[in-house]
């Protein structure tokens, strides 16, 4: 068991949500003490806090004291879509009200960030995210494309035609 730490002073949050991504046994929760049929085919690496991550996360294990891994998240929904909505908003889905996502809630609570977007969604806002009743001031800046593509450009950040970098700078 990892030792207890002091309350955090974090000013930023990186929420990694991988719908259809790697299984928890092959990433953050390898279940290394379980029988082979439950723990998966990969080995583990000990983190700098004493926990274990998959061997695929060796570099992340070195900075585990700087992150929070939530292994106890559950919901009572039968469908993945409804469960995802519940996890990303904290509320069960309702046709009557569109609730804000975690990014919008955090940006609302932290307030403005010196002309920076409230939060960034890569590559785009999920179906279960959005500002809900908080309004567009708390919405994500969506890249709108996959940064892994060779021709990737962040939309709306190009200079207007006829303006070159020399004139702009």
Where are these regions (language model features)?
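Ligand-binding pockets and gating/stacking loops
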Residues: 1-169
